[in-house]
Amino acid sequence: MLIIHSLRQYLLKRLNGLILFTCLAMVATSVNAKATPSLEGQSVLVSVHPMALLIKSAWPELEVSSLVSANQSPHDFVLKPSDMSNIAAADAVIWMGETFEPYLAKALRGQRQVDLSVTLDEADAHANDGQAGDEHENDEHADHHDHDAHIHDPHLWLDPNGIKKILSFVQSSLALPAPKAFIAQYDAWLSSAATTLIPHKDVGFVSFHDAFHAWVETFKLNQVAVVTSNPEKPVGTRHIVEVRNILASGQVQCLFVEPQFQSRIVTKLHKGLSIKVIKIDPMASKFLIDEAGFIKFYQSLLGSFTQCFSGPQD
C-alpha cells in the first residue's frame, strides 16, 4: 500500500507540473499574439500608386489601395467626394507630405497617417545640388524650379537607395513587423540591376520629366538633360531649343518620355532626328497592387534603360 500511495503522489506531482506548464505556455502565446497583432483586415490607403506597390510587396497581409490611380498624374490631382470617403474608411494613410500633396493636408486632419516627406534629409539636398546647378546653364527659369525639385524630390519611390529607409519609417510608424522577406528579395534585385547598368554608365540620355534623379544617382548614369521638372507647367522656348540641340549632337542615345504626358513638346524635340524615343512609366500604371508588384515595376524601369542603352538608334 505504501508503494501504491507513493506512486500516486508522484503521478499527481507530474500531472500538476504538466498542467502548470500548459497554462504558462498558453499565457505566453496570448501575450505574444497581443504584441504582434495580425495584419489581416487592416487597410492602408497610399497617396500614389507606385508607393502602394511598395507597401503591399513589403506587407502582403495588409489591404492596400492607392488614392491617385495608376493612370493619373499627382501633379494636377483634385480630391473627389469618393476620395474623402476612402480616406475616412482607411485604418491609416501614407502620403508624401503637405509640400508635395497640399490637397491632402486638410483631409487628413485627425486621421492616422505616415508623412514620408520626413524621410528626406540634408544628405539628399547635398547629393542633389550638383545637377541642379548644371541646369542653370540651360534655362534660368527652369533652373529655379528644378533646383527646388531636386532638393525636395517627391518621387521617393524612385530612389533605389531610399527604399529600405522608407520601409523602416513605415514599420516604426505603424508598429508593423520587419519586412524581411521583401528586403532580401529587393537586395538581390538591386545587386543584379547594378551589375546590368554598370557597363552603360557613360551612355547619355535625356529625360522629358525629371523623375529619375535619384535613380540616376544610385546607378551613376549619364542623364545629360531634362526637359521639365513639372510637366503641368510650360517649358521655355529657349530650353526646348537647347535640349533639341543636345538630341541632335550625338551626345545621347535616347529620349525618355512618359505615358502620362502626351505633350506636343516631345514631338518638337525629336521630329526629324535619329534618336530613340522610349516610354518609361514612373507611375507603374501597368502593375497591380500585389505582393510581386514593386519588383516587377522596378524591373520594367530597368528594362526601359537597357532598351535605351542597347542597340543602334532609330
Where are the language model's segments positioned?
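Extracytoplasmic metal-acquisition and chelation regions
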Residues: 2, 32-314
